[in-house]
Amino acid sequence: MSPSSLDELIDALRGLPGVGPKSAQRMAYHLLQRDQRGAERLARALGNALAVLRHCERCNTFTETEICQRCASPQRDASLLCVVEMPADLAVIEQTHAYNGLYYVLMGRLSPLDGIGPRELKFDKLLARVADSTVQEVILATNFTNEGEATAHIVAELLAARGIRVSRLSRGVPVGGELEHTDTGTIAQALVERRPL
């Protein structure tokens, strides 16, 4: 017996990050019962995004053009390249207004158990990106998870072998954070990475 349209919708919603079976079922019923216009708008927006979005030839993020606006901007510092895991990470860094260089988006992180290796993350494209000697420093801004650390380590080795200066985002106590509410691993790393005033 083939799955019903409702089952297919619920299963598709379950494929989204952080959405379990109950949440997927609630969303499906909500869209079908109470927000059909919203469901139609969502379907149109998703269809449009799938039709027009592609990867930037330089930084690998999503864009509607061959080269995204950031990569095409002469106001960006082309000597700095920040490597992030996902476009959402790029967006968070942009919101800080503290960085004006360029980016490279890996579209994931190394995860051998999931079959994600250097080829899937297109490390060769990253290496080609820094080969023209415009980039003077690569800032690794992968997440501080085991997979993110492994990804940063491998990328750092590949870049260092080519004479590229590599730096890593530092870790520490968050701004406005109180020590008693901060985990010991973060405090330990903040102590190791302390700096003089």
Curated annotation (Swiss-Prot):
Keywords: DNA damage, DNA recombination, DNA repair, Metal-binding, Zinc, Zinc-finger. It comes from the Bacteria. One of its GO terms (biological process) is DNA repair. SUPFAM superfamilies: Recombination protein RecR (SSF111304). Residues 79-174 form the Toprim domain. One of its GO terms (molecular function) is zinc ion binding. A zinc finger (C4-type) spans 56-71. InterPro entries: DNA_Rcmb_RecR, Rcmb_RecR, Rcmb_RecR_Znf, TOPRIM_dom, TOPRIM_RecR. May play a role in DNA repair. It seems to be involved in an RecBC-independent recombinational process of DNA repair. It may act with RecF and RecO. Belongs to the RecR family. This is Recombination protein RecR. It comes from Aromatoleum aromaticum (strain DSM 19018 / LMG 30748 / EbN1) (Azoarcus sp. (strain EbN1)). The gene is recR.
